[in-house]
Regions:
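Adenylate-forming
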Residues: 10-13
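C-terminal catalytic domains of large/alpha subunits in multi-subunit enzymes
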Residues: 22-285
Length: 285
């Protein structure tokens, strides 16, 4: 069993799952699978490790780097514990699929469990921290496409289809990344067409801080959404991963605005693009 303590507070982005999957990948030589990793969910500012914040699409790729550094120390420690058993230096041994063997004589081998359970069982505890490499970036590449219909009599815009493409390097958690892509389109759709805080012109007090007057898109407003993940560019992370969060909605408003322009022939750059703005642009009000 591996206890992984990297107390970043999960906000729904899937970074915890990325950490577990990345840890299992790094410890694959020990025969570790995700099911054998116990995630430490306890976050206490008195005792917990200091970790990176949930921002800038950086958690998964930054933590994958430090996990890889810690894993190298685990490998070294395991091989050093095997030295008195195999009577050879640690550099003369290797670990594959949970078995330790002598390179010159692969038949001379034992499982990692057999080696670690001899004598007193002393857990291997590794604590590592690592500063982000300022020379590398975790920023992804992305693109959006939108198909819309515009009623030129009422000014109503219907978004029929959205395609979001993210090249975020190696995808560590595919279903989580796709969920972020879809969520980004929902937020981008609202930002472009309906969401707006209205202030009292005299007092500056917000007038629509509620879920009735602040118009968030509902399921009934959702178009067909196609999330596409590419793995062409290799980012800053240990596995060639990089962030995805902010990049899921950055281009959505402009894609919808461009589609509206192609539909009515008039450019509107002021969002949200409500029906009255369409009619005003067409000279109908």
């Amino acid at each position: 069993t591996v206890i992984l303590d990297a107390p970043t507070v999960e906000t729904g982005t899937g970074s915890n799952t990325c950490n577990v999957l990345g840890c299992a990948e790094s410890l694959n030589f020990l025969g570790v699978t995700p099911e054998k990793i116990l995630w430490n969910h306890v976050v206490n500012t008195d005792t917990s490790l200091k970790d990176c914040v949930q921002t800038d699409s950086s958690v998964a790729y930054l933590q994958s780097e430090v996990i890889a550094v810690a894993v190298e120390e685990i490998r070294r420690e395991v091989l050093e514990r095997a030295e008195p058993i195999f009577k050879v230096k640690s550099e003369e041994m290797d670990i594959v699929d949970g078995r330790i063997f002598v390179r010159a004589n692969p038949d001379q081998s034992q499982t990692v469990k057999e080696v670690l359970f001899q004598g007193d069982l002393v857990p291997i505890v590794i604590t590592k921290s690592k500063l982000a490499n300022a020379q590398k970036t975790g920023v992804p590449y992305f693109a959006n496409f939108a198909e819309v219909e515009v009623d030129t009599d009422t000014g109503k815009v219907d978004v029929l289809h959205l395609v979001v493409i993210n090249d975020c390097g190696t995808v560590m958690f595919a279903s989580g990344a796709e969920a972020q892509q879809v969520g980004g389109q929902v937020m981008g759709l609202g930002e472009t067409l309906t969401e707006e805080i209205i202030y009292d012109e005299i007092t500056g007090v917000p007038l629509n801080f509620n879920f009735i007057d602040y118009k968030i898109p509902t399921m009934a407003d959702m178009p067909e959404i196609d999330p596409i993940l590419l793995e062409i560019w290799k980012g800053a992370g240990e596995y060639g991963a990089c962030g995805i969060g902010e990049g899921t909605l950055t281009c959505t408003p402009r894609a919808i605005m461009n589609a509206i322009y192609n539909a009515i022939g008039v450019r509107i750059n002021d969002i949200p693009i409500k029906p009255e703005k369409i009619l005003r642009a067409l000279g109908k009000v």
